A protein has these predicted regions:
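Tryptophan (W) side chains
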Residues: 2, 12-15
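Acidic/polar hotspots within intrinsically disordered regions
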Residues: 4-7, 18
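Conserved ATP-binding subdomain of kinase catalytic cores across diverse folds
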Residues: 17-131, 153-160, 176, 183-187, ...
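C-terminal catalytic region of ATP-dependent kinase domains
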Residues: 53, 170-307
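Aromatic-acidic/polar surface patches that form glycan- and anion
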Residues: 61, 142-146, 248
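Catalytic-loop motifs flanking and including active-site residues across diverse enzymes
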Residues: 64, 68, 148, 255
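An alpha-helical support segment within catalytic cores of ATP-dependent transferases
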Residues: 129-154, 170-173
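A short glycine-rich, hydrophobically flanked beta-strand micro-motif that places a catalytic Asp/Glu
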Residues: 160-169
Length: 307
């Protein structure tokens, strides 16, 4: 069980024998969104967006967040650092803003104990973070190709929500970087099943998929998902505190087994989106132009490109 491993003020908590949780030390403000998360300062000095066990969406969204963020990290996608956050009963009781709105105008205190935390994008460093970029600026996103990779993960894990991302630009940098957030509605939120549909788990605007020309555009992420090791998935599942799924290990194991079986269906699921009426990949099947190294400048831009 979780226990204090520090002397004096509690800074860290311990789960089982090999997982540490970050202690929350201050509530900063409430965040936008249906989960009613809180921005909190951790004992590690970082800002964390914390989702609580009694959030209005479902208890299991905490498990979903941790599992899918870990999967995305493992296949090489850009996601915020995530961790288990310990929120003390004292902190909740002494932070007037730590409430969760419930039905019919009722309110409840945010749950204390083990919560899910995602590091606040941008942190305390100067820079710029936006949740929308016009199409004209999308070409300046450094990792735009990762939207295809995140689509693979969303289809594999049955994300029943639209894909969400924020765009971060560091101070004195010109280009943005996409960071994929909010994995809570993977595995159909609290359902822990997979009611697949072509337009689920996709970004709302097609231009993030402008570089997709075929299956090669989904690499290396597609191959990494199709070959995702069962042992690695088991390690990820073991990180999830049992309180986040009601302690029913059997249900978690069944969901992980289904996820392993779905690896072979990812191309089919992406193909259903490709063939949908939305036509998300207008460049599919076209060959990208590529520069010819070493050609003289007098050739001009057109002369430097080949099919």
């Amino acid at each position: 069980m979780w226990r204090d491993v520090a002397h004096g003020p509690m800074l860290w908590c311990w789960w089982g024998c090999d997982a540490l949780a970050v202690m929350a030390v201050q509530a900063i403000r409430r965040m936008r969104g249906g989960a009613q998360s809180q921005l909190m300062l951790g004992a590690d000095g970082n800002l964390w967006v914390v989702k609580f066990q009694n959030n209005p969406q479902h208890l299991r969204v905490l498990a979903n967040e941790l599992i899918v963020t870990r999967i995305a990290e493992a296949v090489g996608l850009t996601v915020p650092k995530s961790d288990v956050i310990e929120v003390s009963e004292w902190l909740v009781g002494n932070s007037p803003e730590m409430w969760v709105d419930q039905v019919r105008g009722a309110k409840a205190r945010c749950a204390h104990g083990l919560q899910f935390g995602s590091q606040f994008v941008g942190g305390m460093m100067p820079g710029q973070v936006v949740d929308y970029l016009p199409e004209s600026q999308m070409a300046e996103v450094r990792n735009l190709a990762e939207f295809a990779g995140m689509l693979v993960v969303d289809k594999w894990t049955g994300n029943c929500n639209g894909r969400q991302a924020v765009f971060e630009r560091k101070a004195r940098e010109r280009r943005y970087r996409a960071i994929f957030i909010d994995q809570g509605f993977c595995f159909n939120a609290g359902g822990w099943d997979f009611p697949d549909a072509p337009l689920r788990g996709v970004f709302p605007r097609n231009h993030v998929y402008a570089t997709v020309r075929g299956w090669q555009s989904f690499e290396p992420w597609l191959s990494r998902v199709e070959n995702f090791a069962a042992s690695k998935l088991g390690e990820i599942a073991e990180e999830v505190p049992p309180a986040w799924y009601g302690g029913d290990t059997r249900v978690l194991e069944q969901m992980m087994e289904t996820l392993l079986q779905r690896r072979s269906r990812v191309r089919e699921l992406v193909g259903q989106f490709r063939d949908s009426s939305r036509r998300p990949f207008p460049e599919w099947g076209k060959t990208a132009l590529r520069p010819v190294p070493g050609h003289a400048d007098w050739l001009g831009e057109a002369g430097k490109m080949v099919m």
